[in-house]
A protein has these predicted regions:
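Flexible, glycine- and charge-enriched loops at secondary-structure boundaries
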Residues: 2, 42, 46
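A beta-strand edge to alpha-helix "cap/lid" segment located at domain peripheries
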Residues: 4, 50-124
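Short, low-complexity N-terminal intrinsically disordered segments enriched in polar/charged residues
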Residues: 1-27, 31, 123-124
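Hydrophobic pocket/interface hotspot
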Residues: 12, 24-25, 32, 45, ...
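A short gly/proline-enriched turn/hairpin at secondary-structure junctions
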Residues: 33-43
Length: 124
């Protein structure tokens, strides 16, 4: 992996939080990007993915991103635990998530898988 790959996931998160779509695009592979969402939805391609994020996140009032932890499994795979907060119908909401990032040989993000954390029925 090239030096480009170092810190790419962190830069992606910074750009996402700032709604810096051009900056975000620099962290994503030009070819072969696949984003799998928590509802089994799939977005393919860098341009489609950036356009999708721009549409969804700019329409959420009060959108905030709080990164709890970034865990690098190796130079290609990272997990990020975070919460996204926003206002829906005047009511504040927070969604805890875990996102899996995979990076290609060029160090850029080529795979994104989003998982929601669900509240349980009690302690185990």
């Amino acid at each position: 992996m090239t030096e480009v790959g170092a810190g790419v996931v962190e830069r992606y998160l910074e750009c996402l939080a700032a709604h810096d779509w051009d900056g975000l695009a620099t962290t994503i592979a030009d070819d072969g990007l696949t984003r799998e969402g928590p509802f089994c939805d799939v977005v393919e391609g860098k341009q489609h993915y950036v356009a999708y994020l721009r549409k969804v996140l700019t329409n959420l009032k009060g959108h905030r991103l709080e990164v709890k932890r970034v865990s690098h499994v190796n130079e290609r795979v990272s997990y990020v635990e975070l919460s996204e907060s926003f206002v829906i119908d005047g009511v504040p909401a927070t969604w805890p998530e875990c996102i899996l990032f995979e990076q290609g040989d060029d160090g850029l993000i080529s795979q994104v898988s989003v998982f929601f954390k669900q509240p349980g029925g009690g302690t185990a």
